[in-house]
């Protein structure tokens, strides 16, 4: 089957059983949809949440890739017809997925996704400022963890992208600044492989 991988936002949130209109829309049109509660998702205990601290784009992303590979191994997914699509952290996971595993996905849709962990941490909304130290623990500290943040910022590794990509962003998004999308669009269109196109 063609598959749409749909990592949830947050990442400190979770997918749960119940009606989801986006998923139902895709399933109604013949797509299998993979949603997963990767490390860091809430509702599975403190340890499950905390093992994701400082692991954006790393083991959290590996959980998503492992799910996709499982679908391929079980014969559920057509390996040539796998898309990834998500918003907010799910948009980040979409971008990191096509950077880290450029041959895994046939296409990608990022909406309001973080593309540069440095600029994301610099532009958090005012109501998150009291939690900045906690954000540094959960995402990474720009001074102490600079190499890790650089390696896991899709915009700073856009030259690896070969996958056709659609980027969607609201101009006034209070949580994920429009600059996140501007960066990935600018770097993707200048550095991406010839066969990839941006919209």
Positions of PLM-derived features:
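Short beta-strand element of the alpha/beta-hydrolase
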Residues: 1-9
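Acidic helix/loop microenvironments that form the catalytic cleft of cell-wall polysaccharide enzymes
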Residues: 9-11, 89-90
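Short beta->alpha connector loops of Rossmann-like oxidoreductase domains
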Residues: 13-14, 116
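Alpha-helix N-cap/helix-start motif
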Residues: 15-16, 177
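Short amphipathic alpha-helix adjacent to the substrate-entry channel of hydrolases
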Residues: 18-35
């Amino acid at each position: 089957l063609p598959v749409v991988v749909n990592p949830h936002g947050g990442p400190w949130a979770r997918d749960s059983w119940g009606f989801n209109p986006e998923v139902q829309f895709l399933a109604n049109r013949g797509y299998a949809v993979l949603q997963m509660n990767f490390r860091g998702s809430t509702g599975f205990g403190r340890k499950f949440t905390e093992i994701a601290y400082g692991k954006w784009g790393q083991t959290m992303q590996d959980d998503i890739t492992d799910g996709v590979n499982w679908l391929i191994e079980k014969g559920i997914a057509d390996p040539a017809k796998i898309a990834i699509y998500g918003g907010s952290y799910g948009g980040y996971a979409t971008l990191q997925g096509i950077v880290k595993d450029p041959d895994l996905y046939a296409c990608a849709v990022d909406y309001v996704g973080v593309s540069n962990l440095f600029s994301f941490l610099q532009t958090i909304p005012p109501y998150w400022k009291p939690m900045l130290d906690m954000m540094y623990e959960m995402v990474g500290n720009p001074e102490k963890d600079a190499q890790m943040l650089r390696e896991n910022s899709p915009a700073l590794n856009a030259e690896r992208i070969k996958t056709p990509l659609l980027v969607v962003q609201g101009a006034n998004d209070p949580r994920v600044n429009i600059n996140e999308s501007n960066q990935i669009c600018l770097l993707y269109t200048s550095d991406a492989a010839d066969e990839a196109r941006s919209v």
